[in-house]
Amino acid sequence: MERMKQPGEEKNMYSIAFYEKENGESDVWDFLEELREKAATNKDARIQYRQITLYIELLQNNGTRQPDNITKHIEENIWELRPGNNRVFYFYYENNTFVLLHHFRKKTQKTPQREIEQAKAERNDYLRRKEAVKK
């Protein structure tokens, strides 16, 4: 079962899908759920949750046509959302869908190469499994 946010009436131009590992885990979905649960009693979690969900909505409504402080192209077709110190990797998939891959908390000026490589591996896994379903 793929977790997906569908575009509303005329409001959203794009759909958002959450990458899931073969075991069904979704890093971004699980992180958002964790923040949502903590938000009732933790101000930092509440702020992070609001920021990340706002940035996902901006992506859903506007795609990648946004300032670098909101979304940034990393390499190939890997992009990142940039809410606060959090980063959420994603890529564009067919039918106006963006697939959210994984998140990490940024601690250095430059995005760590291992995070980029993980995003590429997740993208490739997603595409491989989608192609297998089509056949």
Where are these predicted regions, by residue range?
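Basic, Lys/Arg-enriched alpha-helical interface segments
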Residues: M1-N85, N95-T97, R105-K135
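ATP-dependent carboxylate-activation loops
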Residues: L101
